[in-house]
């Protein structure tokens, strides 16, 4: 079975800026690949390369075993991008009819409307919709052709909780039907719940790839939280420490060997208290891997 996505050594430069510095990506058929990274990490560039919208300066891309720029590949791909420009004067129903015409075997209109939850807006003009409603309509356009591979770039931004969970169920349904999904998201809970594998990208480099559990273990899955008078810079210099953050009055440490770190901290501060050692949630693992750049996410 060939991978749905196979990219090797992807490099893309814009002038002197290297947006991608030679990354490899693989997504198997019937799986959801989650792509995480701060703004400016290279996620959008990677998606555009995989869709064949731009060409790499080096490396090779295949989707469904084909060059993504070919007509054969494009009739088997659906995409929902962050920046989508569609005529605002058309009704949502008219957009669905138009996009469905691009595919050889599109889904029935009634099925698309139901799966994307468009019953209340299908006869409204696109320009009249709220941000969350537009996202639902764009999701419908991505799946209306019954594609084998779907690119979803921040699909649930602006949606209410009910709509977000409805899209989650549809993503699960796509994978269960043997479709493949590449999902970029700022909602780390979304990646944790939906993705079979996750890749973490920052500054054009692939930092880590694995299952959600493997990503959590990549920061040694160990999160130390305590109240200490030790300076965070001192804690950062201790062996096996990956990152140190402040959480109100507490210090939060990610470490490969938590026992060693706790012993060292107790040796320096016998007043240390409120000690907790636990597995790292995906959000905190992500922040640790990307250097805690929360402001960039």
Q: What is the role of each PLM region?
A:
Residues 168-256:
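ABC transporter nucleotide-binding domain
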Residues 58, 72, 94, 111, ...:
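An acidic, carboxylate-rich microenvironment
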Residues 3-7, 12-202, 208:
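ABC transporter nucleotide-binding domains
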Residues 92, 109, 212, 274, ...:
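Structural motif detector for alpha-helix initiation sites
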Residues 2-3, 220:
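Residue-level preference for beta-strand/loop junctions
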Residues 221-297:
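Short, charged/small-residue-rich alpha-helical element at the C-terminal edge
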Residues 14, 100-103, 116, 219, ...:
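A broad structural signal for alpha-helix termini and local helix breaks/kinks
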């Amino acid at each position: 079975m060939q991978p749905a996505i196979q990219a090797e050594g992807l490099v893309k430069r814009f002038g002197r800026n290297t947006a991608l510095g030679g990354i490899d990506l693989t997504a198997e058929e019937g799986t959801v690949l989650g792509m995480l990274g701060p703004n400016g990490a290279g996620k959008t560039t990677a998606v555009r390369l995989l869709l064949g919208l731009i060409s790499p300066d080096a490396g090779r891309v295949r989707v469904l075993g084909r060059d993504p720029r070919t007509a054969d590949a494009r009739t088997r791909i659906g995409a929902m991008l962050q920046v989508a420009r569609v005529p605002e004067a058309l009704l949502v129903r008219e957009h669905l009819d138009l996009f469905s015409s691009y595919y050889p075997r599109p889904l029935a209109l009634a099925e698309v409307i139901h799966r994307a939850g468009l019953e209340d807006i299908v006869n409204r003009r696109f320009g009249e919709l709220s941000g969350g409603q537009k996202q639902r309509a764009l999701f419908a356009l991505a799946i209306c052709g019954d594609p084998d591979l779907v690119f979803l770039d921040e699909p649930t931004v602006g949606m209410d909780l009910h709509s977000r969970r409805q899209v989650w169920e549809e993503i699960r349904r796509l994978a269960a039907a043997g479709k493949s999904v590449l999902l970029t998201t700022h909602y780390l809970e979304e990646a944790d719940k939906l993705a079979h594998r996750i890749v973490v990208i920052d500054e054009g480099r692939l930092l880590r790839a694995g299952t959600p559990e493997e990503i959590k273990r990549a920061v040694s899955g160990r999160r130390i939280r305590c109240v200490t008078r030790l300076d965070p810079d001192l804690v950062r210099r201790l062996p096996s420490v990956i990152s140190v953050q402040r959480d109100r009055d507490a210090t939060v440490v990610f470490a490969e060997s938590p026992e060693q770190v706790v012993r060292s901290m107790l040796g320096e501060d016998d007043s240390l208290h409120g000690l907790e050692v636990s597995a790292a949630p995906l959000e905190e693992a992500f922040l640790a891997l990307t250097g805690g750049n929360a402001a960039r996410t």
